[in-house]
Amino acid sequence: KFICPDGVDWDVFLDALNNLGVRYTKEKPCFQIDVYFDTPQYILLNSGAAVRIRQSGEAYIGAYKVSQNQQGAIFERREFEWKLSDNETKLWNDEKKPTIPPTIIDKLNLHEQTLRKVLAVETHRHIAVVNGNDGFKAELSLDEVTFRGHKGQAHYREIEVELLNGRLEQLKQLADSLQNHLKLQPAVDSKYKKGLILVGKYGITPPMH
């Protein structure tokens, strides 16, 4: 993941891919809203985890993410997703109550603390899918983000390179090429952490790991 510089828009990004000789197909841009939850003591944040409900089109999808390894701009994470049923979606829209499967709750180790909404993230996402040799496949996205939290709102732009299939080494090569070509700075924080730093309650500065 990289911080997207002001001078780089989607056209500039695609030009860079063309100049690098990368084969890609453009996907339809999308808009999504993520709502993140944590305990009053920010147990999830402090353990490198995140729980969110995402609205994308008509679908509502929950996710639990936990960091495993990070080297510069490369994040390795485990991710568990679940789709909200019609009834669960209604409960979410009417009462803002998230439905989280018991198996996920067990993993969270909340120590009987309750989860509450701590951050909303609105993302306009442009997407290109790269198909390389040996079955290598990666999703590239340029995100125009608005964070909404206790301290108001803040804007942020990010470039993400996600491995869909193939070797991590191939992903690193692609990420390095883009970083050098566009002079990108690594994004060292997850979106959740970045949002809390910018607009979180009391200007919380999450502990550095």
Segment roles from a protein language model:
Residues 1-209:
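Phosphate-end processing signature that detects enzymes handling 5′-triphosphorylated RNA
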